[in-house]
């Protein structure tokens, strides 16, 4: 079988896959911070809060993209391990066209239910104009956003991690260029920020389409290949829906946290919005290194190379925990200075710095959860994937939030995620220990 991965140099191959993913996501962090910076320069708390309230909308669109992006790439990686090139073409084409259709349907539904959804997000009379402007553009651009997460996942599973990074960086650079023009110079505020985001995604989508059409050896977007078997559909949805649940739970987390912060004022929601964006520095580095292992985990599982997989799992866990501890220390020690880059109000700086520290205290536990979640997704383990998808930012978080708020009031809102991280990491390690066919010796 003609392997697409160099398994003789396992760690080098892992970093070859992971580093472009990390770099691409770090550019995404730069964009998010730039976006936040330009919005925060308005010194308009209602504007900052209004845009922050719409964060779950973006996460929800990501979730729908990941149903077919992560679900499809997980299956494709295993098919590549089995040297089934015909199957990879069919699955990739199916995922592309179903995702496009999903994006169009979502756009229509989001516009139809715009007002009630904005109410659920927590928009008030003060923040509604800004939230509605941002939300409307995101809704119209839903197909472009959903497709972007399909493309970036699919090209990585064929080993084109660098090309995936180029696509992500290209769209983000366009986004960053447009931000100051549309937000400040043209004066479109929240709507301008959203337009910049969607235009960036459109440009990235066009690049990925060209890449799949001209450069891919195994993937396809030909309509004639848009069909899968019942078993393949079950595998795509089994992994993809659990991956999407993780994103949807993240949206629910933000909504619930904002609802609990609402009695304390819009300044608390605005500060949390900024702190969450800054904490993404650590989170997305961990996501990048975790996602870098997906093609390898899926390939090794499909090729039944269990000893090599166990070696890679041990290495990745050690590496991720180490880098998480370092990033956590850096962000904690510089929390005030980082908040000061975005706002000058002393009260908001102090509030945001405390929020940021709580967001990253347990980054090492988050790294363990991320890696084991993608491991279960890559190997098609639906039940463990499902349990982890609804734990850290779902059921476990909501329980932690209710209990912590009851015991510590405002401080409980801030510490809930840290408590959920510790409990969910314990669950993840327990599930790994129970997954004999992944960790068993050959």
What are these regions (language model features)?
Residues 60, 175-180, 205-209, 281-284, ...:
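Hydrophobic transmembrane alpha-helices of multi-pass small-molecule transporters
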Residues 1-18, 76-143, 185-241, 297-362, ...:
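Short alpha-helical transmembrane segments in multi-pass integral membrane proteins
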Residues 26, 30-49, 118-125, 181-188, ...:
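Helix-terminus/linker motif at the lipid-water interface of multi-pass membrane proteins
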Residues 69, 137-156, 164-172, 193-206, ...:
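Short runs within selected transmembrane alpha-helices of multi-pass transporters and secretion channels
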Residues 16-35, 137, 171, 200-204, ...:
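Transmembrane helical elements of multi-pass membrane transporters/channels
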Residues 6-37, 41-43, 56-71, 75, ...:
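N-terminal transmembrane alpha-helices
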Residues 48-108, 145-164, 271-329, 333-335, ...:
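Small-residue-rich hydrophobic transmembrane alpha-helices
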Residues 15, 30-31, 68, 109-113, ...:
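Residue-level signal for transmembrane alpha-helical positions in Major Facilitator Superfamily
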């Amino acid at each position: 079988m003609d392997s697409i991965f160099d398994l003789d140099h396992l760690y080098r191959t892992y970093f070859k896959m992971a580093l472009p993913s990390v770099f691409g996501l770090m550019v995404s962090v730069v964009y998010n911070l730039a976006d936040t910076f330009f919005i925060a320069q308005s010194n308009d708390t209602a504007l900052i809060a209004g845009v922050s309230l719409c964060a779950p909308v973006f996460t929800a669109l990501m979730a729908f993209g990941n149903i077919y992006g992560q679900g499809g790439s997980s299956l494709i990686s295993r098919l590549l391990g089995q040297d089934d090139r015909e199957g990879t073409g069919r699955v990739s084409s199916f995922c592309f066209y179903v995702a496009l259709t999903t994006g169009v349907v979502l756009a229509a539904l989001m516009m139809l239910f715009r007002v009630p959804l904005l109410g659920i997000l927590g928009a008030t009379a003060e923040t509604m104009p800004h939230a509605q402007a941002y939300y409307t553009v995101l809704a119209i651009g839903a197909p472009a956003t959903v497709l972007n997460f399909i493309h970036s996942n699919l090209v990585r599973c064929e080993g084109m991690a660098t090309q995936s990074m180029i696509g992500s960086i290209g769209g983000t650079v366009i986004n960053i260029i447009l931000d100051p023009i549309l937000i400040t110079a043209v004066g479109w505020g929240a709507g301008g920020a959203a337009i910049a985001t969607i235009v960036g995604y459109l440009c990235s989508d066009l690049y990925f389409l060209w890449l799949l059409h001209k450069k891919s050896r195994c993937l396809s977007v030909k309509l004639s290949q848009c069909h899968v078997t019942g078993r393949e559909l079950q595998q795509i949805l089994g992994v993809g829906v659990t991956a999407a649940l993780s994103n949807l739970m993240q949206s629910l987390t933000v909504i619930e946290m904002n609802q609990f912060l609402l009695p304390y004022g819009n300044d608390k929601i605005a500060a949390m919005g900024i702190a969450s964006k800054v904490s993404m520095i650590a989170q997305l580095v961990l996501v990048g290194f975790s996602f870098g292992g997906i093609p390898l985990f899926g390939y090794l599982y499909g090729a039944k190379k269990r000893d090599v997989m166990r070696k890679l799992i041990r290495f990745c866990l050690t590496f991720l925990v180490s880098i998480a501890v370092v990033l956590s220390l850096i962000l904690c020690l510089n929390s005030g200075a980082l908040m000061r880059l975005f706002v000058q109000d002393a009260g908001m700086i102090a509030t945001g710095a405390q929020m940021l520290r709580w967001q990253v205290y347990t980054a090492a536990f988050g790294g363990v959860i991320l890696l084991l979640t993608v491991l279960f997704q890559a190997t098609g383990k639906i039940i463990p994937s499902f349990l982890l998808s609804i734990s850290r930012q779902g059921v476990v978080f909501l329980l932690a939030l209710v209990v912590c708020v009851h015991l510590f009031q405002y401080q409980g809102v801030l510490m809930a995620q840290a408590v959920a991280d510790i409990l969910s990491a314990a669950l993840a390690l327990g599930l790994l220990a129970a997954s004999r066919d992944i960790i068993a010796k050959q």
